[in-house]
Amino acid sequence: VIGGDECNINEHPFLVLVYYDDYQCGGTLINEEWVLTAAHCNGKNMEIYLGVHSKKVPNKDVQRRVPKEKFFCDSSKTYTKWNKDIMLIRLDRPVRKSAHIAPLSLPSSPPSVGSVCRVMGWGTITSPQETYPDVPHCAKINLLDYSECRAAYPGLPPKSRTLCAGVLEGGKDTCGGDSGGPLICNGQFQGIVSWGGDPCAQPHEPGSYTNVFDHLDWIKGIIAGNTDATCPL
């Protein structure tokens, strides 16, 4: 996260740290057995850590899990920059709630443009040179109209299942290593960090986030055991 500050140790009990291959992502615990992240965070040898704040000085209640099952909209190959960058992971065993571990509920109402949103993650705090922090950083950004992202990235289709968020003057943004983490607007879990400008946090180059609300039926269906649940087109 660029332009943020160290998160409060008690404000992110739902934030998970995902390692795969040699990369890292964020993710969000949505109940004791399920984590929501980005499809592009899929890889071999995935490890999921819950209850982390400082990587160097771990909390006593850190728990480690591996995926038992992974679910994608159609397949792990169909996501694009503007569609289906979402992955639901069933953990190998449920986690115990503790001081630094608790789920974040799914949104009860759709996102509204203009809301103030919070982003968080262990991603780089500088760009284009990368500096990875020991603790997660948090920043406030705004939910922007999708047209702002279309203006910045001409390849985007007229409509998509993504949210556009950032600050138009630049300086605050998610960045490499934050992918898969949550976008929390007006207290509700509305987006999953997907992609953005390179370098990060440039003026008029907001970030793109998978729209969680649009995928609720699919998420709830999979968790309920309906493996035929379909993603919105």
From Swiss-Prot:
Localisation per UniProt entry: Secreted
InterPro entries: Peptidase_S1_PA, Peptidase_S1_PA_chymotrypsin, Peptidase_S1A, Trypsin_dom, TRYPSIN_HIS, TRYPSIN_SER
Disulfide bonds: 7-138, 25-41, 73-231, 117-185, 149-164, 175-200
Gene Ontology biological-process annotations: proteolysis; venom-mediated fibrinogenolysis in another organism; venom-mediated suppression of blood coagulation
CC annotations in GO: extracellular region; secretory granule
Entry keyword annotation includes Protease: yes
Expression tissues: Expressed by the venom gland.
UniProt EC number: 3.4.21.-
Protein name per UniProt: Thrombin-like enzyme elegaxobin-1
Positions annotated as active site in the UniProt record: 40 (charge relay system), 85 (charge relay system), 179 (charge relay system)
Function description: Thrombin-like snake venom serine protease that clots rabbit fibrinogen. Only the beta chain of fibrinogen (FGB) is cleaved, releasing fibrinopeptide B. Incubation with human fibrinogen alpha and beta resulted in cleavage of both fibrinogen chains but generated neither fibrinopeptide A nor fibrinopeptide B. Promotes clotting of rabbit fibrinogen, but not bovine or human fibrinogen.
Family under the similarity heading: Belongs to the peptidase S1 family. Snake venom subfamily.
One MF annotation (Gene Ontology) recorded for this entry: serine-type endopeptidase activity
Organism: Protobothrops elegans
Major location (coarse): secreted
Keyword hit for Transcription regulation: no
Subunit record text: Monomer.
Keywords on record: Blood coagulation cascade activating toxin, Disulfide bond, Hemostasis impairing toxin, Hydrolase, Protease, Secreted, Serine protease, Toxin
